[in-house]
């Protein structure tokens, strides 16, 4: 079993070198694949002897055990990449994962906010306090750019150009993109940089654009707590919330106002257009709701 676990680490090292995956993604692969190895060894199998039927049985047991389809899909993705790696490295003469059936995933629409709800959320921070001025600038940038929360908290001073009104983002797979900020976000960034950030740093030298109260890089979890705090103040239902709620609103509202789908794809940093297309369903659903509410024959 130790040898199989060592092969997982070799695979993760290769992934990190080739694809520059985030640590969270690598940790998820490690957990899933370690579980696969333990499951196989419990049945007298190894990575070298496992067959497609074994892996399909494992997936079936997960479904019967009440695991969500998304969890099974993630596990299947990990197994496919791993066994493809073992095949390329000539540790195996075949790839048993190639025969596995994919679980059917329910299409879930992203949680979105109306433009009025977003406006209330953006107005929630008290801008006369440095900490909340930082949060105000972060919310404005998030809605103006559609960044992922991890991208937002990772921004540095050198990533923004207020003169040009753009932000440079290093997204998934280490892909770089330039995203316009818009006048409102630029204004609040300028205000924050003059009246908020110096107070937060308190003499500490750090390149992070949005430091925490301890003059360190803020975590995604911390910012998520801040969003929930302001949502309560704005009277927004918690069911409407997710860490990426403003990213979803950014995409949906752009499409509602006639933006081209491929432009939205580029701004969001999606490598696959199908990932962006789900926002068209959100926009369509919003139109359907409005029709039902206001049309006399709906």
Swiss-Prot record:
Highest taxon above the source species: Bacteria
Q: Where is the Tyr recombinase domain?
A: 108-292
* A cellular component annotation (GO) from this entry: cytoplasm
Q: Which GO terms describe its molecular function?
A: DNA binding; tyrosine-based site-specific recombinase activity
Residue positions of the active site: 148, 172, 244, 247, 270, 279 (o-(3'-phospho-dna)-tyrosine intermediate)
Question: What result follows from mutating residue 171 to W?
Answer: Abolishes recombinase activity
Gene of this entry: xerD
This protein's name: Tyrosine recombinase XerD
What family is it from?
Belongs to the 'phage' integrase family. XerD subfamily.
Activity regulation here?
A: FtsK may regulate the catalytic switch between XerC and XerD in the heterotetrameric complex during the two steps of the recombination process.
Assembly state and interactors?
A: Forms a cyclic heterotetrameric complex composed of two molecules of XerC and two molecules of XerD, in which XerC interacts with XerD via its C-terminal region, XerD interacts with XerC via its C-terminal region and so on.
Single GO BP term: resolution of DNA recombination intermediates
Q: Where in the cell is it found?
A: Cytoplasm
Which residues belong to any copy of the Core-binding (CB) domain? 2-87
